[in-house]
Every structure is written in structure tokens, then in C-alpha cells.
Amino acid sequence: MAYVPAPGYQPTYNPTLPYKRPIPGGLSVGMSIYIQGIAKDNMRRFHVNFAVGQDEGADIAFHFNPRFDGWDKVVFNTMQSGQWGKEEKKKSMPFQKGHHFELVFMVMSEHYKVVVNGTPFYEYGHRLPLQMVTHLQVDGDLELQSINFLGGQPAASQYPGTMTIPAYPSAGYNPPQMNSLPVMAGPPIFNPPVPYVGTLQGGLTARRTIIIKGYVLPTAKNLIINFKVGSTGDIAFHMNPRIGDCVVRNSYMNGSWGSEERKIPYNPFGAGQFFDLSIRCGTDRFKVFANGQHLFDFSHRFQAFQRVDMLEIKGDITLSYVQI
């Protein structure tokens, strides 16, 4: 079953290195780039480049370069006409060898804002117009799990915060037919606290997609995601991943739990790992994708699913991004 990304949300899972690909729609204020991966045990350095074109020797608007070399630091720079500019550096290393990480670049009007594992790390002022940037390059001593482009204007004013996600970018990308695209209603929330309760404005509708990105704590036992009717407490869809075991699905209606569903091809929730969930509401079922792979379907038991107006997330996790 093919994974259909939501509008404005462009993920690539398990890309190979070196990664050199166009930025969908080009770089613009308000865009965020999420990079999830693992720093290798023998890591010495890696880099992320925001490049002006795909050719060798192309200008690099922003060079991000963590270095484990006895003087652990992160170097920032710009290259124009084959010449590097003045280095900026921070003598602090937010990455740990052998550990998962989440690296976020937020494109602001005056600078790039770098966030590592949910903590703001650095701001790098634009030396080249960001509109010139066309490609993202990643290489070095790391393993990539996913790269996500969250696109467009208007700009987010701060981190955490919100920004509006527009429709699919057009340049360099041919989207599926419009009738196959999920509909996303609300702005994304960055780094919301756990437990999280969000309001589904207008209720749950067919073809609406919920995106949840987070991190399973190393000591985690489980987490819970509920699609609820606020006025009654009914739970149309209860999803309960149990770390190292199974993913339980159920519903709670009229004061009683229904029959559990547990069968899945694999459990994508591991202690100390990031996850990327896409939950799409259809006319007769929920479709759940984890890290771009179909995980399971859950048929509607609560037929008036349009009355579902709350999303509840709790458990042994941190959240980096929720789009409702």
C-alpha cells in the first residue's frame, strides 16, 4: 500500500549517502527541514549543505559541519566562487556517537535557526539570498533515517511555535492527483508538551491526515494516542504501542472497551528511537503509516467519526512535531 504524504510534507525515508537532492519548491521563509539519523560510533565529522545548484563546486549558502576531532565543535560557513568565507564556530557538540538525533533547520527571514533534539543550538545569518538555494546535501559519518521538508510561507516566528503549511510545492515534484491527497486543516505545533491535547477544528473528516513526530524515551514502556469525542469521552480510535511488544488498537464507547486488535507486521516503536506517524481518516477506516510504511488499518466502530474533535497523546515520549 503506497504511502501518500500530506500536502506540504515531503518525507524521504532511509536515504543513501551521499544525499544530494533538490529541495521541493526551493527554499523559502517558514520552511523547516527535519533530519533524523544516527551518529556512527566512529564519527569524526559530517556536513549538511544548502547548495546553489547541483554541480560540483556550486556555491554553498550554508555549510553545517559537526567535527569530533579532539576539539569537539560545529563549524558554520558559506562558499562563494570556490572560496570559503569567514568561519563561525560553536565549541559545543550536541551529537553523541552511537546515538539517534533529530536535526532541524528552520528558515527565517534573517537567518537559519538550528535546533538539535528539540533544543535551539545556533542561528546563522544569511550571506546569500535564500531564494538561490536549490539543493540539500548531506554526507559523512552518520546513518540517515529520514529527511522531511515542511514547506512554505508565512514564516514561523519562533521555536517552538506554529506556521502555516501550504499546498504541495510545484518545482521538481509531480504530486499525485488532487483527489488522492489528504487534507490537513490545522497549523503544525513544534515541540508540544506531553501529555498533549489538541482540538480538531471542524471535527474529524474523511481524508484528513494527522502527522505525529516524536522520540521514544530510552526507558519507555508505552504510549497512547486517542481520537476522542470531547463531549462524551468516547474514544473512536485508541492506539497503544507497547515498547518491545505490540501495538494495541481499540475503541471505548458508552463506557466500555471493545475488542482489542494486535496483529501488525512489525513494531516500529523502539526505546531510544524517533518515529514518524501518519494517521489518515477514511470513510470506513483509519490508515496508519509509520516511517513511511503501512502499519495497519482500523475500521471505524464509531460511525459518526465526524464528532471526534480531540487528539490526545501521552506516555513515555517527547514530541517534536504534531500536525492536526
UniProtKB/Swiss-Prot annotation:
<dbReference type="GO" id="GO:0016936">
    <property type="term" value="F:galactoside binding"/>
</dbReference>
<dbReference type="GO" id="GO:0030246">
    <property type="term" value="F:carbohydrate binding"/>
</dbReference>
<dbReference type="GO" id="GO:0042742">
    <property type="term" value="P:defense response to bacterium"/>
</dbReference>
<feature type="binding site">
    <location>
        <begin position="257"/>
        <end position="263"/>
    </location>
    <ligand>
        <name>a beta-D-galactoside</name>
    </ligand>
</feature>
<dbReference type="InterPro" id="IPR001079">
    <property type="entry name" value="Galectin_CRD"/>
</dbReference>
<keyword id="KW-0677">Repeat</keyword>
<dbReference type="InterPro" id="IPR044156">
    <property type="entry name" value="Galectin-like"/>
</dbReference>
<keyword id="KW-0597">Phosphoprotein</keyword>
<feature type="modified residue" description="Phosphoserine">
    <location>
        <position position="259"/>
    </location>
</feature>
<dbReference type="InterPro" id="IPR013320">
    <property type="entry name" value="ConA-like_dom_sf"/>
</dbReference>
<comment type="subunit">
    <text>Monomer.</text>
</comment>
<comment type="function">
    <text>Galectin that binds lactose and a related range of sugars.</text>
</comment>
<dbReference type="Pfam" id="PF00337">
    <property type="entry name" value="Gal-bind_lectin"/>
</dbReference>
<feature type="domain" description="Galectin 2">
    <location>
        <begin position="196"/>
        <end position="324"/>
    </location>
</feature>
<keyword id="KW-0430">Lectin</keyword>
<protein>
    <recommendedName>
        <fullName>Galectin-4</fullName>
    </recommendedName>
</protein>
<feature type="domain" description="Galectin 1">
    <location>
        <begin position="19"/>
        <end position="150"/>
    </location>
</feature>
<dbReference type="GO" id="GO:0002780">
    <property type="term" value="P:antibacterial peptide biosynthetic process"/>
</dbReference>
<dbReference type="GO" id="GO:0005615">
    <property type="term" value="C:extracellular space"/>
</dbReference>
